[in-house]
Amino acid sequence: MSETGETSEYYKQALEEYKEVQEDEDPDVWDTRISKTGCYVENLALQLCHAETGDWRQCFNEMALFRKCWEKNGNRERVSTVDVDGTTSKDSEKKK
């Protein structure tokens, strides 16, 4: 039975690493930028999954968790991205 979301080993490992980053008095620029998205743990869990499996298809649960976090924290509006259909996140907002 496969683990999902916040119960995955990747998520648990990412959460532990995030606790260490928060205690760091001089975090690097990358950690600071990712932390500001509000999705540091979800991002790291996805990276850990891909690094171990080498196959994004095996990381659907981590991807779904990251996507949910990204949207919940308003990052689609803050950062311009391009969707599969070629529209940007800013184009999507204009249509609303």
UniProtKB/Swiss-Prot annotation:
Biological role: Involved in cytochrome c oxidase assembly or stability.
Keywords: Disulfide bond, Membrane, Mitochondrion, Mitochondrion inner membrane, Repeat
Subcellular localization, as worded in the UniProt entry: Mitochondrion inner membrane; Mitochondrion intermembrane space
PANTHER family reported for this sequence: CYTOCHROME C OXIDASE ASSEMBLY FACTOR 4 HOMOLOG, MITOCHONDRIAL
Source organism of the structure: Saccharomyces cerevisiae (strain ATCC 204508 / S288c) (Baker's yeast)
Gene behind this protein: COA4
Domain notes per entry: The twin Cx9C motifs are involved in the recognition by the mitochondrial MIA40-ERV1 disulfide relay system and the subsequent transfer of disulfide bonds by dithiol/disulfide exchange reactions to the newly imported protein.
Domain of life: Eukaryota
Residue span(s) of domain CHCH: 36-77
Any one GO CC term of the record: nucleus
Name of protein: Cytochrome oxidase assembly factor 4
Miscellaneous comment text of the record: Present with 907 molecules/cell in log phase SD medium.
Family (UniProt): Belongs to the COA4 family.
Motif window: Cx9C motif 2: 59-69
Membrane protein topology class: Peripheral membrane protein
Span of the annotated motif Cx9C motif 1: 39-49
Pfam families (alphabetical): CHCH
Entry-linked InterPro entries: CHCH, Coa4-like
BP-aspect Gene Ontology terms: mitochondrial cytochrome c oxidase assembly; mitochondrial respiratory chain complex assembly
